[in-house]
């Protein structure tokens, strides 16, 4: 059997919670054929080490700097950084020369939860809708990027999303549908940040094989579903 080539990751935001989780999972899962060959700090404009993909979980400014680095070296760019400026999002969505992946939440289970909420919106059109999210006290954006994404699918303005910041909560999202007769609540609760970090490893392995263009969780989910049918 032909040995798979190791994918060298340039990790932007390695000191953050997600960066640390990604680094640890790469080390714990050698069968994934990924290594962190380089890390990048704020304001660092160049990298001496070789890399095959830029993975970013940092800040809006850090994400933009990391993208320029990916463009410079013509390497795939994967980011899960939230609260990105609209002009930069448009730039990512318009990219054609390198593979670019963006998702405010990289978990497949959260993606399918969002799809379930969309179906519920179609089923309970006469119901009052509400969305509540809980994250750890260190999270800077509120509501979260994931909550904004779910709210969009529910037809709710971001201002109507309620939120809490409690302890070290990884992430909980609850969509509620209420009528005079009953109430339905759909909830996704992440209990470990490894849920997201493990998905990043799979997305990175997938993205390096893609052609130039913009990709989302929808594209990755379709790939995974096809893979399961084989």
Where are these regions (language model features)?
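C-terminal substrate-binding/catalytic lobe of Rossmann-fold NAD(P)-dependent oxidoreductases
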Residues: 8-12, 17-48, 61, 125-230
